[in-house]
């Protein structure tokens, strides 16, 4: 296996893991970075693998919590509510994704759309942060979330179907806008990523499994492990960060990155295939 290809697969896995749980759009970063370093492996299969690696980082980080929930379902009220909230939050985006997946990829998966959503999302984060700084959040614990709170976060997640919006960005900001404390909204976003990304991965596997070849196994494993490790680091770091600070730095980053995408696209440095 060529060392340069291995290095590129490693870098792509790291990009996925570090950006998946930050409100900065992992999709945009993977496309731009993949173009810049010339990574042209079996794209969709590789993407599925690194997304799975990233989501398993959340499962590992919260393994005790998920274990308690699994053992408590049907017996423990707190576990039942947790599962119910995840199910409620999961449904809106899952339904809309199944209904409009083809149209979204056909009409919205382009550099202009992604760049615009990055910039608009950046300004939206600035507005939400300014709003929360003026009002005391009503909910400061994941276990205190009600089904209606989960539904509002789920509705917000629908916007993440538009490339460039960011799943974590839409769910966290949607939660904060609804009156949920920043760290609590972030944690619930992590939890919601598990069923959402597992379902998306399963859907993509059914669509693209025929493109898998044994030749890709090595690169897939490298990307998977890199995404898992970097995702674990990102989850820990983000929780620590939002415990003391806000999301404003990410807002400015999004705005700049959106402009960079337009420049790179117009200059021919990146393609969108």
Curated annotation (Swiss-Prot):
GO terms for cellular component: plasma membrane. Its EC number is 3.6.1.27. It is an enzyme of class 3 (hydrolase). The keyword Phosphoprotein does not apply. The chain crosses the membrane at residues 13-35, 45-62, 82-102, 108-128, 186-206, 219-239, 250-270. Keywords: Antibiotic resistance, Cell inner membrane, Cell membrane, Cell shape, Cell wall biogenesis/degradation, Hydrolase, Membrane, Peptidoglycan synthesis, Transmembrane, Transmembrane helix. It is a multi-pass membrane protein. Pfam families: BacA (PF02673). It is found in: Cell inner membrane. HAMAP family: Undec_diphosphatase. This is Undecaprenyl-diphosphatase.
């Amino acid at each position: 296996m060529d060392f340069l290809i291995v290095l590129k697969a490693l870098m792509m896995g790291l990009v996925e893991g570090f950006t998946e749980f930050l409100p900065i759009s992992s999709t945009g970063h993977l496309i731009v970075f993949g173009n810049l370093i010339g990574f042209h492996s079996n794209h969709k299969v590789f993407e599925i693998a690194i997304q799975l690696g990233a989501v398993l980082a959340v499962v590992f980080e919260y393994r005790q919590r998920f274990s308690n929930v699994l053992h408590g379902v049907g017996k423990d009220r707190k576990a039942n509510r947790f599962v119910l909230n995840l199910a409620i939050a999961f449904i809106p985006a899952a339904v809309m994704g199944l209904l409009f997946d083809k149209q979204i990829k056909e009409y919205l998966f382009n550099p202009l759309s992604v760049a615009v959503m990055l910039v608009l999302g950046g300004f939206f984060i600035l507005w939400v942060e300014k709003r929360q700084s003026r009002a005391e959040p009503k909910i400061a614990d994941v276990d205190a979330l009600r089904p209606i709170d989960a539904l509002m976060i789920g509705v917000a997640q629908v916007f993440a179907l538009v490339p460039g919006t960011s799943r974590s960005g839409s769910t966290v900001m949607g939660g904060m806008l609804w009156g949920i404390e920043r760290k609590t909204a972030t944690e619930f976003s992590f939890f919601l990523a598990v069923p959402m990304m597992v379902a998306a991965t399963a859907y993509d596997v059914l669509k693209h499994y025929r493109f898998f070849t044994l030749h890709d196994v090595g690169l897939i494993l490298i990307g998977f492990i890199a995404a898992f490790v970097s995702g674990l680091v990102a989850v820990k770091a983000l929780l620590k960060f939002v415990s003391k600070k806000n999301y404003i730095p990410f807002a400015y980053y999004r705005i700049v990155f959106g402009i960079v995408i337009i420049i790179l696209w117009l200059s021919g440095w990146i393609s969108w295939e």
